Amino acid sequence: DRDSCVDKSRCAKYGYYGQCEVCCKKAGHNGGTCMFFKCMCVNSKMN
C-alpha cells in the first residue's frame, strides 16, 4: 500500500534514503525520497 514504506524506512532529513528507494521500488513505485524524516514514494504513472 502507498504508505507502507513510510513506517518501514525511517531516514535522515537530509542524506541517505537508499532503503526508502528500494522499498518503494519493491512496492511498484519508481523510487522514493526522504522528506521530514519520512519516506515518500515517487510514482510516475501520469504519462
UniProtKB/Swiss-Prot annotation:
<comment type="function">
    <text>Reversibly blocks Kv11/ERG potassium channels.</text>
</comment>
<protein>
    <recommendedName>
        <fullName>Potassium channel toxin gamma-KTx 5.1</fullName>
    </recommendedName>
</protein>
<feature type="disulfide bond">
    <location>
        <begin position="5"/>
        <end position="23"/>
    </location>
</feature>
<feature type="disulfide bond">
    <location>
        <begin position="11"/>
        <end position="34"/>
    </location>
</feature>
<keyword id="KW-0964">Secreted</keyword>
<keyword id="KW-0872">Ion channel impairing toxin</keyword>
<feature type="disulfide bond">
    <location>
        <begin position="20"/>
        <end position="39"/>
    </location>
</feature>
<dbReference type="InterPro" id="IPR012622">
    <property type="entry name" value="Ergtoxin"/>
</dbReference>
<dbReference type="GO" id="GO:0090729">
    <property type="term" value="F:toxin activity"/>
</dbReference>
<keyword id="KW-1015">Disulfide bond</keyword>
<comment type="similarity">
    <text>Belongs to the ergtoxin family. Gamma-KTx 5 subfamily.</text>
</comment>
<dbReference type="GO" id="GO:0019870">
    <property type="term" value="F:potassium channel inhibitor activity"/>
</dbReference>
<keyword id="KW-0800">Toxin</keyword>
<dbReference type="GO" id="GO:0005576">
    <property type="term" value="C:extracellular region"/>
</dbReference>
<dbReference type="InterPro" id="IPR036574">
    <property type="entry name" value="Scorpion_toxin-like_sf"/>
</dbReference>
<keyword id="KW-0960">Knottin</keyword>
<keyword id="KW-0528">Neurotoxin</keyword>
<feature type="disulfide bond">
    <location>
        <begin position="24"/>
        <end position="41"/>
    </location>
</feature>
<keyword id="KW-0632">Potassium channel impairing toxin</keyword>
<dbReference type="Pfam" id="PF08086">
    <property type="entry name" value="Toxin_17"/>
</dbReference>
<keyword id="KW-1220">Voltage-gated potassium channel impairing toxin</keyword>
